[in-house]
Amino acid sequence: MEPLVSVVIPVYKTEKYVVKSVNSILTQSYKNTEIIIVDDGSPDSCPKICDDLQKSDNRIIVIHKENGGLSSARNTGIDAANGKYVFFLDSDDTLYADAVSDMVKIAEEENSDAVIPDSYYKVFETDDRTVKAYHFTEKDFSCDPKVFALNVLIGKGRASRSTAVLYSMKCIKENNLRFPLGKISEDFFFNLDFLAVAGKISVYKKPSLYNLKREGSLSASYHKGFFDTILEMDEKVKEFTTKIDNKKYKEYIGNKRHSLLVKNTLVYAMSIMKSEQEPYGERVALCISIFENSRVKEAVSEMSEAPFFPGRAKTAFIKLLFGMVKKNMYRLACFTAYIAFKLAGV
């Protein structure tokens, strides 16, 4: 008999999208699923929509709870899940029709704790464009979870997304893995914890997810105070590299911790300069305070080249910013980022 797959869908203020999202699971070629919809105290019509969906198919379970955020909703879903595997899906995204079937087959045949897609589709709501994007290349992938974490999640700052990944429920529950509460970039923390304890992972060489890019979504927002999260991510990487067998993985560790910190810092500084929530001078002052952080300065000084970034134009721009920051040309770096956004929307 086909193993049961639990699909956890947190719902909050997505009344326009949730039905389409759930239907993308109901119409999967793989039928042995339980769909756990977690209404995270949504103040719109989502609770009623969820209840109506439950009436339409006996595979759907609806849990109503007080608002606690995305991590809280996902954790509620984990606690309720009965499947051999668990699959997370955001309530404004949809799945490729054979994704669950294909990924379960891979997990079963290769005895893997997770199956990770190498790519996904970005669907832009404003102009209805669909663009294929890659999490990582075939060359980057390793079935050793720790090597994958070091090379991709940490080394390139990629593939941190937990949605549309097939996870072993046994691995999650035996190691008491949960999404951290009250954090931005919760997927990164969860995946690093998972990869630290997983025995083997496999790759799905197709896009499994249609990821909706919409105005006002959580992932599209500029977050004040995100630098605190960047430093927490850096500490998490330090914890990860300390726990694993340094002798076995020494060649993979290198300066990847520094690289991720610098990449996250530069990207955040760029988002600050793009934002118009504060006056230009205040944005520059904030960026300078970040560049002068002792941990950032240490990481920059240890790196001889800019961190990885996808795309030629953005790679060139990151190299330019990195060179300025390395030479303590902070104000020029801020001005360059500001002008680039104004002229080209980098």
Roles of regions detected by a PLM:
Residues 3-6, 24, 34, 189:
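Cell-envelope/extracellular polymer assembly enzymes that use nucleotide-activated donors
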Residues 13-27:
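Short, well-formed alpha-helical segments that are part of the catalytic scaffolds
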Residues 25, 40-41, 68, 91:
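Conserved short acidic donor-positioning loop in nucleotide-sugar-dependent glycosyltransferases
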Residues 39-49, 66:
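A conserved acidic beta->alpha catalytic loop
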Residues 70, 91-204, 211-227:
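Donor-binding/catalytic cores of nucleotide-activated saccharide
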Residues 86:
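Short aromatic/hydrophobic "clamp" motif used to bind/position activated sugar donors
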Residues 274-346:
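Membrane-interface aromatic/basic loop that binds lipid-linked glycans or pyrophosphate carriers
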